[in-house]
Amino acid sequence: MKTIHQTNVGGAGGFYTGMEYARLADADWIWCMDDDVFPRLDCLEQLLAYAGYEGVGILAPRRLLEGRIYTNDFLSFNLTRPFSSMYSGRLSKMEVNSPVEISGTAFEGLFVRGEVVRLVGLPNKDLFIFCDDTDYCLRTVAAGYKILYVPTALMDKEKFFSDDSWGERNKKKKWKRFYQIRNSSYLNHHYGKNWAVKYLRGFNGVIGYILIAFFSAPFSGAYRWTDIPMFWKAYTDGIRERLGRL
């Protein structure tokens, strides 16, 4: 086992460093996961059963939260319709009992072929946190590889902030919201196929957070009115593709 110590470079920077080390070690496959997921004993075995499928570059396990299926995996990217989500065909709305080809998954058990990393490159470390996995899946699919969701490969996901109130939970997560807004705006601007997706989808998203902050600030400790210009800056940084640690 190799432990790498570095400064706080966010989740994206952590995956960048880990995957770079594995690539230099000429790894055939690289298993990426956050610290809040725990693979079942046969999870890797179940993933490897599909490693030989033609064109597969990434294998994605099924995650369970408190014993129930937890997934934000999806079938395809929507890069043309600005008033619909970027993520089309969410598996959370389907019953999936056999492997299915998808377009996006999370860095929570993502099992990527070393060949993909050598061709597509490393995660975008300048995203810091949020959307680095979506960006990587976009690049992988664009390079012609398939992503396969394997429902028999199971991982358990830990639940954080389970006993917190709405205000407490959002106060703890607020710093992440700025990255979420900026990076999702960046993705839409960078990969969107038309002006509306590039600018309006991110705008719609940030307006929602601005309204929540405006109306909840007097009544909860989650947001303050001073957060509003910061939310707007996160959006403008995204569409100008200014990344890095905030």
Regions found by a protein language model. Give the residues of each.
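Conserved donor nucleotide-binding strand/loop of the catalytic core
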Residues: 1-13, 21-24
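A short, conserved alpha-helix in the catalytic core of glycosyltransferases
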Residues: 110, 116-121, 126-153
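Acidic donor-diphosphate engagement hotspot in glycosyltransferases and nucleotidyltransferases
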Residues: 15, 42-44, 132
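Short beta-strand-to-loop acidic/aromatic patch adjacent to the donor-nucleotide binding site
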Residues: 27-36
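Active-site donor/metal-binding and catalytic loop motifs
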Residues: 150-169
